């Protein structure tokens, strides 16, 4: 089995790895891939995190479905409680069959690869932490090469690439 998780987790607890691996490693569950999720509030409870998912990915997926029509891929991405979670686990069949992106599109890209190569019946979601926080990025509204701006661009490219590969014609309009 292979488990991946963010390297900048402030509230890291080694039980996260066990929670991720359990459904994949259990011999009777039949899961090949597990995706982590967690409550995205700040440690002091005063701020709701997960800005890119809440303000970009979820609206993008809904807008694309409205624009191009329903698709299995968009339904699949939309079904994840936190698609940008950096925590996932997989068996070796998944690990050997997917390409892992090397930019901020990694999480969406991995989900797209799992979607392409494996049935969703072998995918599960796991609540990996009661308390979760990691280092946060600046918005960088004026710099497309940094912060959340760069992250959003990379994620959009990963989604658009997957849609184009599946036959959706994307035009500059």
Go through the PLM ranges and name each one:
Residues 1-12:
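Short beta-strand-to-loop acidic/aromatic patch adjacent to the donor-nucleotide binding site
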Residues 13-42:
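Conserved donor-nucleotide/metal-binding helix-loop-beta segment in metal-dependent transferases, i.e.
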Residues 44-51, 65-87:
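A recurrent flexible, glycine/aromatic-enriched loop bordering the glycosyltransferase active site
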Residues 54, 88, 104:
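Residues that recognize and position ribonucleotide moieties
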Residues 57-62:
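Conserved Class I S-adenosyl-L-methionine
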Residues 89, 93-94:
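Short, well-ordered alpha-helical scaffold segment located
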Residues 96-102:
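Conserved nucleotide-sugar donor-binding catalytic segment
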Residues 104, 108-173:
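C-terminal catalytic/acceptor-binding lobe
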């Amino acid at each position: 089995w292979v488990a991946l998780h963010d390297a900048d987790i402030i509230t890291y607890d080694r039980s996260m790895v066990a929670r991720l691996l359990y459904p994949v490693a259990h011999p009777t569950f039949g899961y090949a891939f597990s995706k982590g999720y967690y409550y995205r509030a700040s440690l002091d409870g005063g701020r709701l995190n997960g800005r890119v998912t809440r303000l970009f990915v979820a609206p993008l997926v809904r807008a694309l479905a409205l624009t191009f029509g329903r698709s299995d891929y968009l339904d699949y991405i939309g079904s994840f409680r936190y698609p940008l979670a950096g925590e996932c686990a997989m068996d070796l069949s998944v690990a050997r069959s997917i390409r892992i992106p090397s930019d901020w599109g990694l999480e969406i890209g991995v989900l797209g690869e799992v979607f392409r190569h494996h049935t969703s019946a072998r995918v599960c979601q796991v609540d990996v932490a009661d308390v979760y926080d990691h280092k946060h990025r600046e918005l960088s509204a004026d710099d497309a090469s940094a912060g959340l701006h760069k992250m959003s661009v990379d994620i959009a490219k990963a989604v658009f690439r997957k849609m184009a590969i599946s036959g959706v014609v994307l035009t500059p309009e």
